[in-house]
């Protein structure tokens, strides 16, 4: 086997066949049926693959799950529980996502994580929030509120103490000093 043949096989492995994207065409092949064919309809031997259907099925299941979570919250108007979590490592983010998938609200405080770890964890939670159609709101410099789709968070324009100092200090203040 030459190098060219190996290379061609490698390319063929990763390319899509044009045939698979075309709709299924019925061919004039004989269909074998049993003696009791009047009771059961005959099925063709070759059936198209179900890969395109599974993607649409996953999307519809996601929408159904989101609606199910919204309906559950409307039925259960008892007490609302907000879990408070202090993650110390990145692996704690999966537990937080499990709580969100269970239709619970979580207040997350990243004070025990480094800034790099907290950013990485927050990116993971933000992605999970988009998948589960939740809400992620910053409520303090190191605290975030993660809520499911059925919880509405009304946050006024909060100015955090750290943001006030950084927002007011600028180059204009240096120029306006009186000596």
UniProtKB/Swiss-Prot annotation:
It comes from the Bacteria. Its main location: cytoplasm. One of its GO terms (cellular component) is cytoplasm. It is found in: Cytoplasm. Keywords: Cell cycle, Cell division, Cytoplasm, Septation. Gene3D superfamilies: SepF-like protein. Residues 22-55 are annotated as: Disordered. Residues 33-55 have a biased composition (Polar residues). One of its GO terms (biological process) is division septum assembly. The keyword Hydrolase does not apply. Cell division protein that is part of the divisome complex and is recruited early to the Z-ring. Probably stimulates Z-ring formation, perhaps through the cross-linking of FtsZ protofilaments. Its function overlaps with FtsA. Homodimer. Interacts with FtsZ. PANTHER family: CELL DIVISION PROTEIN SEPF. Belongs to the SepF family. This is Cell division protein SepF.
């Amino acid at each position: 086997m030459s190098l060219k043949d190996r290379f061609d096989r490698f390319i063929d492995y990763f390319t899509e066949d044009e045939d698979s994207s075309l709709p299924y065409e019925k061919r004039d092949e004989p269909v074998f049926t049993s003696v009791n064919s009047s009771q059961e309809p005959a099925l063709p031997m070759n059936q198209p693959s179900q890969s395109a259907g599974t993607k649409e099925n996953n999307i519809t299941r996601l929408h159904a799950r989101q609606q199910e979570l919204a309906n559950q919250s409307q039925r259960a108007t008892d007490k609302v529980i907000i879990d408070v979590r202090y993650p110390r490592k990145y692996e704690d983010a999966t537990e937080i996502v499990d709580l969100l998938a269970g239709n619970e609200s979580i207040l997350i405080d990243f004070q025990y994580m480094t800034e790099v770890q907290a950013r990485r964890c927050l990116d993971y939670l933000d992605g999970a929030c988009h998948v589960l159609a939740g809400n992620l709101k910053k409520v303090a410099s190191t605290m975030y509120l993660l809520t499911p789709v059925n919880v509405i968070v009304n946050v006024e324009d909060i100015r955090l103490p750290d943001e006030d100092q950084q927002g007011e200090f600028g180059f204009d203040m240096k120029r306006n000093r009186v000596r």
